[in-house]
Amino acid sequence: MEGGLRTGRLPKAPELSLQSFPSEWSWVWTYPLFHKLAAFACHASQAWLTVGITSESREGPNGLLDTLASLYHTSSTSEQKQMTVLVHLADSDPTWLRRTIIRISSLYRSQILTGQLLLIHAPPDAYPAVNDAQNKVSRGQIYSKQNVDHAFLMSFATKLSTYFLLIEDNVFCAPNFVNHIRSKVGYRKPNTWVLLEFSNMGFLGKLLHSRDLPLLAHFLLLFHKERPLNWLLLHFRTLLGQQSSILCRPFLFYHRLTHLTFENKTLIGHEKDPPDPYTLSGTVYTDMRFSDTHSPQEAYTLDESFFWSYNVTTGNYLTVILNNPANLNRVQVRTGSITDGKYILEKGQVELGYDPEGTPPQCTSFTLLGRLVQGQMDQFILESIGYKVSCVKLAVNANQVGGLMIRHIYIWGENAKNRKDVQIDNDDDDDDDDYDDDS
């Protein structure tokens, strides 16, 4: 990247001070145990990194508790001294709020007392109104909630640290992630980047300068109904002069599989979680080298097993052939070691296949679902291409010397015979932004 980046490239924005907020900190609601905490946050010494999380109630396991456990268990004592964890409890249900706060305070009392863990909540009347002509939740309403939640989070985080890391409440972290991030930041001059990305999933693992947070919070509020958070983050980055994504390997943060993220529920047009992965029986075939120790079928399990190969070439494949055609709504592929990022499939793509013939069966037609980015893919599927799928194929797009680890191929869906005819709606033409790998 040539030269430095300046926030002055954007029109000057006022400090975040909504009329909804009578004073700077009055929008922060705290459970009685934390009344002193908000005051402490205004005067605490700066940390090097703030990890920001927005969370709300949902069915199933509490992903926030698992995420906090991962944050603290994978970071050393010295790393924790450099880090403040800021959690915005963005749900209006008082029962959930009290239960969550009491649970967190019992588990992380020492972190709370030392100011390493802060919990905040914005009351419902602080949110801007979003009108919808129909009696249903619109995309604008969901985008608005997501963006305003994070605007509040970033506004509070502005003076807590030098850098701000945005993650979600359903993730696990790589060991010593703070040191890894610090190392990557140390290689780059501060004025040569706006956004570093330690995950290729939505807004997960995005690192910003805390000095840019007031402007970003204002930007999110200006366009809170227009676009999802991940799109606005990339547009903000571009407006401040960083044209290409900077993907930092190895990736340090990955989604857990307990539930969908708030954003992706929106994109697939329903609110209920899909069935668990690997609910569909099938057989895995490959033309890659392998041993009995790590067989192809181990790429299609929910345990810690994996498929191992080496010296793959263009055109090699690993294909899951389903016993029955299925209606799929999501496919996730993970390659490489989670701890150090080695052995990923450097160039590959995932295809959906239809109309199998022969013995063993082979699909006679394929549709490209997407290409891997840094060896990973997690793609939601339009009904127009996810109907009666019989094959999920991972294809190699370039020769690759050395080892290849395929940790898993997860699919979500149901047997086609158990589902009524699909009505395809092609009216949704929202754009998706592509990533450029600049690392």
UniProtKB/Swiss-Prot annotation:
One of its GO terms (molecular function) is glycosyltransferase activity. It comes from the Eukaryota. This is Alpha-1,3-mannosyl-glycoprotein 4-beta-N-acetylglucosaminyltransferase-like protein MGAT4E. It is an enzyme of class 2 (transferase). The keyword Glycosyltransferase applies. Glycosyltransferase-like protein that may participate in the transfer of N-acetylglucosamine (GlcNAc) to the core mannose residues of N-linked glycans. InterPro entries: Glyco_transf_54, MGAT4_A/B/C_C. Pathway: Protein modification; protein glycosylation. GO terms for biological process: protein glycosylation. Keywords: Glycosyltransferase, Transferase. Its EC number is 2.4.1.-. Pfam families: MGAT4_cons, MGAT4A_C. The keyword Glycosyltransferase applies. It comes from Mus musculus (Mouse).
